[in-house]
Amino acid sequence: MMLCDAHCHTAGISLCSRVPADQLVELFVQEGLGAIVLTNHYKRAHVRGEFRDWVKRYVDEYELTRALGEKKGLKVFFGVEVTPDEMTQNDFTIYGLTKEDVVNGPELYALSFDALCDFAHSRNALIYHAHPFRRTTPVDGTKIDGTEINCHPLYKTCAEKEVRAFADKYGLRLSCGADYHGDTYKAHCGMWIPKSIETTAQFVEYIRENKRPELCIAPDPVDPIE
């Protein structure tokens, strides 16, 4: 098995990130992880220039990170973190959209919550409510496929107990990631997945069939900033 951090960002797209792709890859390699899912922000406030040009850059940033990871022995899978205009306190990580879905698809942040879920499911993707207890409350769990234990050390707690209760109530999948932006130390956390997984499609099929993979959850920070 290998540890996969299912939530991280690079500065090339996520404007709140301080870490470029090469540094991100090097950090995860040094930490000993086998894989990551790059989930850069897909949010109206992060778009620079024309939308169609921006989504191409979004995909290019992933390809850059994937290529850098390949050279270092780190597998990099493709994900998206969408913040809908209608509910900007809520973020959703989507696993299973293709690069073509992102480049040719609608402006995902402009979709309603229901329409975003429908779009993800129409592409056979899985949609997770990221950090559902961070400055917000969980959405309707019947609409989504999973939720996340988020170990970003900027916040007081990963809310593991509450997230698990939410997941149990609706039979949701669970993921885990550090939400690393380079603004704090990198929490050691993630999901244990087979080393044989090589592609994003294989990763998505694994979490589709294994709703509750073993998680590595970082302890809550002793001195959070918030």
Question: Language-model features: where?
Answer:
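Charged catalytic cores and adjacent phosphate/nucleic-acid-binding surfaces used
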Residues: M1-A6, T10, S14, P20-E26, ...
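An N-terminally biased module of ancient metal coordination in phosphate/nucleic-acid-related enzymes
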Residues: M1-F78, T83-E86, T142, K161, ...
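Surface-exposed amphipathic alpha-helices with a cationic face
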Residues: L3, V29, R66-E70, S112-L126, ...
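Short, flexible loop segments at the rims of nucleotide/cofactor-binding pockets, characterized by
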Residues: G12-C16, W54-V55, V103-L108, A125-Y128, ...
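Active-site-proximal loop/helix segments of hydrolase catalytic cores
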Residues: R18, Y109, R123, Y128-V139
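Conserved beta-strand positions in the central sheet of alpha/beta enzyme cores
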Residues: V37-L38, Y128-H129, E148
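Binuclear metal-dependent hydrolase catalytic cores centered on His/Asp/Glu-rich metal-binding motifs
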Residues: N90-N124
